[in-house]
């Protein structure tokens, strides 16, 4: 109980005392759900409903009118609209997929088929030969089973972007400077490759042998590429550029196998329709074309990063 003459009230911080209700007429004073936060915007209980809930309920549901701190409380209205809500890590790699795209538009996307960067130096040649060796192994192991091929290889395809983004992120932190949009570009690339994996997992689940290969491949490739990037980051980007060239070739062959009837053209998974804004009638071949366009974008991004003669982690080509 607080008395009328109690000096404690005068010493209470303003941000706490606003939660006390003092009666000047009565000797006794009552509490009205004392605020528990010491920062601005603190939530406190009043009549069983939090202040934050009251603010949230009073706002319009249009994301453009809701203050940024409250936007993450709003759930998407559409059933499968999560990819349209996420910004940053959920963005598509190509602007064509930021809006609904028709199957004809998808088919006519210019991904510059056959585009190849001719090695200009010893490091470029070194990166190219490594990729050709990896391609030979993949061809020998998977043959023309392209669904299995992409499920396994997309598990390692998502590693380079994350490693490159991590190194640039650490550079920015230790040098106390902003090195631009390259971090976001690389991390987005990694997330985009992960979406490729999740899409094809809806078509085919890997067998026991493939799962063992995936675990071993992740261990070897992650550690190997991390050392590679630490020693020669420019060459590492050239290496990824060549990897993506081979990925485009693989998806060209994947598309051809579907057209020839060697691979069943099943309905596109739900996740692919949401992620690439594909129409409801989209099929597997349309997913292949969308993924191929992404790979072409990654090819160009990594070759562009490697093209700088004065390459550094501070360099930002975007």
Swiss-Prot record:
Belongs to the alternative oxidase family. Alternative oxidase which function may be to reoxidize reducing equivalents produced by glycolysis such as ubiquinol. GO terms for biological process: alternative respiration. The keyword Membrane applies. It is a multi-pass membrane protein. Fe cation 2 binds at residues 193, 244, 295, 298. It catalyses: 2 a ubiquinol + O2 = 2 a ubiquinone + 2 H2O. Keywords: Electron transport, Iron, Membrane, Metal-binding, Mitosome, Oxidoreductase, Respiratory chain, Transmembrane, Transmembrane helix, Transport. Its EC number is 1.10.3.11. This is Ubiquinol oxidase. It is found in: Mitosome membrane. It comes from Trachipleistophora hominis (Microsporidian parasite). One of its GO terms (cellular component) is mitosome. The gene is AOX. The keyword Metal-binding applies. The lineage of its organism: Eukaryota, Fungi, Fungi incertae sedis, Microsporidia, Pleistophoridae. The chain crosses the membrane at residues 150-170, 212-232.
